Amino acid sequence: MGRLFGTDGVRGVANADLTAELALGLSVAAAHVLAEAGTFEGHRPVAVVGRDPRASGEFLEAAVVAGLASAGVDVLLVGVLPTPAVAHLTGALGADLGVMLSASHNAMPDNGIKFFARGGHKLADDLEDRIEAVYEEHRTGAPWDRPTGAGVGRVTSYGEGADQYVAHLMSVLPNRLDGIKVVLDEAHGAAARVSPDAFTRAGAEIITIGAEPDGLNINDGCGSTHLAKLRAAVVEHGADLGIAHDGDADRCLAVDHTGAEVDGDQILAVLALAMRERSALRSDTVVATVMSNLGFKLAMEREGLSFVQTAVGDRYVLEEMKEHGYALGGEQSGHVIILDHATTGDGTLTGLLLAARVAQTGRTLQDLASVMERLPQVLVNVPDVDRARVKTSAELATAVAEAERELGATGRVLLRPSGTEPLVRVMVEAADIEQARSVAGRLADAVKSALG
């Protein structure tokens, strides 16, 4: 069996790859692994379970709850909430485990399972590996040790989670948003209720789009992966900025008053300067990934800030932040982690802080984001190739070396197998867009030739 866990939990097509049987089995295995690790010692274990609004979340939620309760874990069902809300509630309610059912920005047919440890942090890789091993052991015949009678878990609907999460967001906002007009695109996802509520409570005038989830329309032509509607709405309504979330609202992209995109790198740059001003940017350091634009690194250096780079995936950004005590990190895709206030990327918190900076300074988001100049960057996804051989193919290594010689010091190349999808990402930065496109196209062809 290949590794089930990717960089962001377990994902696949619901009811094909991610079945009710798999969801149930992994949940039972997670309960047993945490019990064996001593997490439940001395008390009756509790788990928080939430989901995004996609239709398959309903039967997968039932399977996860059945698995946990059958393993003796009491379950608090918080319903449809963003991933960062489930992580926050896992910590705030003192739960031993959190489970989020979502495939984030993926299309509606997909779904996923993400586990959070006590405190709301993602499970460590070694615990995920152990869950897989225990699941596989019992899938092939070993019986579970099952509690009976009063030992089985109880299931309770917990309806206060949304209000608790929004109250938390209000408590960490540095200033109000009075006088600011914001367009919110909620991707017909998990933040369709809480994000507009939070911005309204903070004093902003809001226009909301993509906030009518029906279980089928999540991420469909809207949200952080499809910004066209948000751009148009910002210009139409004369808004100060627009905020886009994905299906589970763990990421945030923005649009300035002209309709131009402000990506995760630019958001990090704006927040880094704001946090330094408040003496909240510990060690004057920002953590980002190898996918961050070279312009971000140059901007941070110019502003006298340090820049630490990690592998792609917000879990690796978070690990670096936790290990060294850094306060701010994130990804170009819009995952932004403010570790003093969240244990994972939080799109609503990020959007609130970005709007707060606009309100506090009186400057436009366009002006604030100009602190960094994005170098032309081209990203090409190459599907249906053997992504496991990216680092071992001699043919591909030769093609990369030739590209790097052509780009010189004014560009860079990155080939990366996706952690959540069956494809290889080719990223090229160059001094001009035509060169970046040309090199990226040749490298994409080389990937197909070498790994197809």
Curated annotation (Swiss-Prot):
One of its GO terms (molecular function) is magnesium ion binding. CDD domains: GlmM. The active site is at residue 104. Mg(2+) binds at residues 104, 246, 248, 250. Activated by phosphorylation. InterPro entries: A-D-PHexomutase_a/b/a-I (IPR005844), A-D-PHexomutase_a/b/a-I/II/III (IPR016055), A-D-PHexomutase_a/b/a-II (IPR005845), A-D-PHexomutase_a/b/a-III (IPR005846), A-D-PHexomutase_C (IPR005843), A-D-PHexomutase_C_sf (IPR036900), Alpha-D-phosphohexomutase_SF (IPR005841), GlmM_bact (IPR006352). Binds 1 Mg(2+) ion per subunit. Keywords: Isomerase, Magnesium, Metal-binding, Phosphoprotein. The keyword Metal-binding applies. Its EC number is 5.4.2.10. It catalyses: alpha-D-glucosamine 1-phosphate = D-glucosamine 6-phosphate. NCBIfam families: glmM. Catalyzes the conversion of glucosamine-6-phosphate to glucosamine-1-phosphate. This is Phosphoglucosamine mutase.
